[in-house]
Amino acid sequence: YFIGVPLLVSCEALATYVALRAVELFASDRLLIAVWLFRLVQCEAFYLLTVALKRLIIGKFAAGKRPGTLRDVLRRWLLDRFTRNALFLGATEPYVNTELLSRKYRLLGARIGKRVNVDFFDSVEYDLLDIGDEVVFGSCVVLAPSDDAEDLPIRIDDGANVLDHSVLLGGVTVERRAVTGTCT
Protein backbone atom coordinates (compact mmCIF):
# COMPACT_ATOMS: atom_id res chain seq x y z
CA TYR A 1 0.00 0.00 0.00
CA PHE A 2 2.89 2.39 0.65
CA ILE A 3 4.08 2.10 -2.95
CA GLY A 4 1.02 1.12 -4.99
CA VAL A 5 -1.55 3.60 -3.71
CA PRO A 6 0.71 6.67 -4.09
CA LEU A 7 1.68 5.46 -7.58
CA LEU A 8 -1.99 5.05 -8.55
CA VAL A 9 -2.94 8.46 -7.16
CA SER A 10 0.07 10.07 -8.87
CA CYS A 11 -0.93 8.61 -12.23
CA GLU A 12 -4.52 9.79 -11.75
CA ALA A 13 -3.21 13.27 -10.91
CA LEU A 14 -0.90 13.31 -13.94
CA ALA A 15 -3.75 12.24 -16.24
CA THR A 16 -5.95 14.98 -14.76
CA TYR A 17 -3.19 17.56 -15.21
CA VAL A 18 -2.74 16.64 -18.88
CA ALA A 19 -6.51 16.88 -19.40
CA LEU A 20 -6.70 20.28 -17.70
CA ARG A 21 -3.90 21.60 -19.90
CA ALA A 22 -5.83 20.41 -22.97
CA VAL A 23 -9.02 22.14 -21.76
CA GLU A 24 -7.17 25.46 -21.38
CA LEU A 25 -6.93 25.57 -25.18
CA PHE A 26 -10.69 26.22 -25.47
CA ALA A 27 -12.44 29.53 -24.98
CA SER A 28 -15.04 29.78 -22.23
CA ASP A 29 -17.94 29.85 -24.72
CA ARG A 30 -17.03 26.29 -25.76
CA LEU A 31 -17.30 24.86 -22.25
CA LEU A 32 -19.40 21.83 -23.22
CA ILE A 33 -16.74 20.69 -25.68
CA ALA A 34 -14.06 21.36 -23.08
CA VAL A 35 -15.76 19.14 -20.49
CA TRP A 36 -16.08 16.30 -22.99
CA LEU A 37 -12.48 16.76 -24.09
CA PHE A 38 -11.30 16.82 -20.46
CA ARG A 39 -12.82 13.43 -19.73
CA LEU A 40 -11.55 11.91 -22.97
CA VAL A 41 -7.99 13.16 -22.51
CA GLN A 42 -7.96 12.23 -18.82
CA CYS A 43 -9.03 8.62 -19.51
CA GLU A 44 -6.70 8.15 -22.49
CA ALA A 45 -3.75 9.64 -20.58
CA PHE A 46 -4.40 7.26 -17.69
CA TYR A 47 -4.61 4.35 -20.13
CA LEU A 48 -1.23 5.30 -21.64
CA LEU A 49 0.26 5.54 -18.14
CA THR A 50 -1.12 2.05 -17.44
CA VAL A 51 0.56 0.70 -20.59
CA ALA A 52 3.84 2.37 -19.56
CA LEU A 53 3.54 0.90 -16.06
CA LYS A 54 2.88 -2.55 -17.53
CA ARG A 55 5.87 -2.41 -19.86
CA LEU A 56 8.41 -0.63 -17.65
CA ILE A 57 7.65 -1.75 -14.09
CA ILE A 58 5.36 -4.77 -14.08
CA GLY A 59 6.83 -6.63 -17.05
CA LYS A 60 5.52 -9.74 -18.78
CA PHE A 61 3.70 -12.60 -17.14
CA ALA A 62 5.01 -16.03 -18.12
CA ALA A 63 3.44 -19.46 -17.86
CA GLY A 64 4.72 -21.64 -15.05
CA LYS A 65 4.83 -21.89 -11.29
CA ARG A 66 4.16 -18.62 -9.48
CA PRO A 67 7.17 -17.39 -7.54
CA GLY A 68 5.09 -16.26 -4.58
CA THR A 69 7.44 -13.36 -3.86
CA LEU A 70 6.33 -9.99 -2.58
CA ARG A 71 7.38 -8.41 -5.89
CA ASP A 72 5.16 -10.81 -7.83
CA VAL A 73 2.18 -10.12 -5.59
CA LEU A 74 2.80 -6.36 -5.80
CA ARG A 75 2.97 -6.27 -9.59
CA ARG A 76 -0.28 -8.22 -9.95
CA TRP A 77 -1.98 -6.03 -7.36
CA LEU A 78 -0.75 -2.84 -9.07
CA LEU A 79 -1.96 -3.87 -12.51
CA ASP A 80 -5.28 -5.00 -11.02
CA ARG A 81 -5.74 -1.59 -9.33
CA PHE A 82 -4.89 0.25 -12.54
CA THR A 83 -7.14 -1.85 -14.80
CA ARG A 84 -10.12 -1.57 -12.43
CA ASN A 85 -9.78 2.20 -12.11
CA ALA A 86 -12.66 4.28 -13.46
CA LEU A 87 -10.28 6.18 -15.76
CA PHE A 88 -9.02 2.92 -17.33
CA LEU A 89 -12.59 1.76 -17.80
CA GLY A 90 -13.41 5.12 -19.36
CA ALA A 91 -10.63 4.53 -21.90
CA THR A 92 -11.73 0.99 -22.82
CA GLU A 93 -15.48 0.52 -22.34
CA PRO A 94 -16.57 3.04 -25.02
CA TYR A 95 -14.75 0.96 -27.64
CA VAL A 96 -16.56 -2.33 -26.99
CA ASN A 97 -16.88 -4.46 -30.14
CA THR A 98 -14.39 -2.37 -32.09
CA GLU A 99 -10.92 -3.08 -33.43
CA LEU A 100 -9.62 -0.24 -31.27
CA LEU A 101 -10.36 -2.20 -28.09
CA SER A 102 -8.45 -5.17 -29.52
CA ARG A 103 -5.50 -2.87 -30.16
CA LYS A 104 -5.66 -1.53 -26.62
CA TYR A 105 -5.56 -5.07 -25.23
CA ARG A 106 -2.64 -5.88 -27.55
CA LEU A 107 -0.70 -2.96 -26.05
CA LEU A 108 -1.14 -4.62 -22.65
CA GLY A 109 0.33 -7.87 -23.97
CA ALA A 110 -2.64 -9.94 -25.17
CA ARG A 111 -2.32 -11.77 -28.48
CA ILE A 112 -5.57 -11.08 -30.32
CA GLY A 113 -6.32 -12.09 -33.90
CA LYS A 114 -8.16 -10.31 -36.68
CA ARG A 115 -11.85 -9.38 -36.68
CA VAL A 116 -12.36 -10.21 -33.02
CA ASN A 117 -15.62 -8.94 -31.54
CA VAL A 118 -14.17 -8.02 -28.15
CA ASP A 119 -16.40 -6.94 -25.33
CA PHE A 120 -14.79 -5.59 -22.19
CA PHE A 121 -13.31 -8.55 -20.28
CA ASP A 122 -11.72 -8.80 -16.86
CA SER A 123 -8.12 -9.99 -16.69
CA VAL A 124 -4.76 -9.03 -15.19
CA GLU A 125 -2.26 -11.34 -16.89
CA TYR A 126 -2.83 -10.17 -20.48
CA ASP A 127 0.42 -11.80 -21.66
CA LEU A 128 -1.12 -15.24 -21.07
CA LEU A 129 -4.09 -14.66 -23.40
CA ASP A 130 -4.01 -16.05 -26.93
CA ILE A 131 -7.17 -15.23 -28.89
CA GLY A 132 -7.58 -16.38 -32.49
CA ASP A 133 -9.29 -14.77 -35.48
CA GLU A 134 -13.04 -14.05 -35.65
CA VAL A 135 -13.70 -14.79 -31.97
CA VAL A 136 -16.84 -13.34 -30.37
CA PHE A 137 -17.05 -12.32 -26.70
CA GLY A 138 -20.16 -11.73 -24.65
CA SER A 139 -20.31 -9.25 -21.81
CA CYS A 140 -18.81 -9.64 -18.32
CA VAL A 141 -16.30 -12.35 -19.29
CA VAL A 142 -13.51 -13.14 -16.82
CA LEU A 143 -10.22 -14.54 -18.13
CA ALA A 144 -8.19 -15.73 -15.14
CA PRO A 145 -5.00 -17.50 -16.24
CA SER A 146 -3.55 -17.42 -12.74
CA ASP A 147 -4.29 -19.11 -9.44
CA ASP A 148 -2.30 -19.32 -6.21
CA ALA A 149 0.05 -22.00 -7.55
CA GLU A 150 0.71 -21.36 -11.24
CA ASP A 151 0.08 -19.29 -14.33
CA LEU A 152 -1.23 -21.11 -17.39
CA PRO A 153 -2.14 -19.60 -20.76
CA ILE A 154 -5.72 -19.34 -21.98
CA ARG A 155 -6.18 -20.11 -25.67
CA ILE A 156 -9.30 -19.31 -27.65
CA ASP A 157 -9.10 -20.73 -31.17
CA ASP A 158 -10.45 -19.20 -34.39
CA GLY A 159 -14.20 -18.70 -34.63
CA ALA A 160 -14.99 -19.55 -31.00
CA ASN A 161 -17.70 -17.80 -28.99
CA VAL A 162 -17.24 -17.00 -25.31
CA LEU A 163 -20.68 -15.92 -24.16
CA ASP A 164 -21.89 -13.66 -21.35
CA HIS A 165 -20.64 -14.13 -17.79
CA SER A 166 -18.23 -16.93 -18.72
CA VAL A 167 -15.14 -17.57 -16.59
CA LEU A 168 -12.12 -19.16 -18.27
CA LEU A 169 -9.33 -20.39 -16.01
CA GLY A 170 -5.67 -20.97 -16.79
CA GLY A 171 -4.89 -23.91 -19.07
CA VAL A 172 -8.26 -23.79 -20.84
CA THR A 173 -8.45 -24.06 -24.62
CA VAL A 174 -11.71 -23.14 -26.30
CA GLU A 175 -11.44 -25.07 -29.54
CA ARG A 176 -12.16 -23.85 -33.05
CA ARG A 177 -15.80 -22.75 -33.50
CA ALA A 178 -16.74 -23.93 -30.00
CA VAL A 179 -19.30 -22.01 -27.96
CA THR A 180 -19.19 -21.58 -24.20
CA GLY A 181 -22.66 -21.16 -22.78
CA THR A 182 -23.76 -18.24 -20.70
CA CYS A 183 -22.53 -18.39 -17.08
CA THR A 184 -20.07 -21.25 -17.68
Task: Outline where the language-model segments fall.
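Terminal amphipathic alpha-helical/low-complexity segments used for targeting or macromolecular assembly
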Residues: Y1-G109
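Structural signal for interior beta-strand "rungs" in well-ordered beta-sheet cores
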Residues: Y105-T184
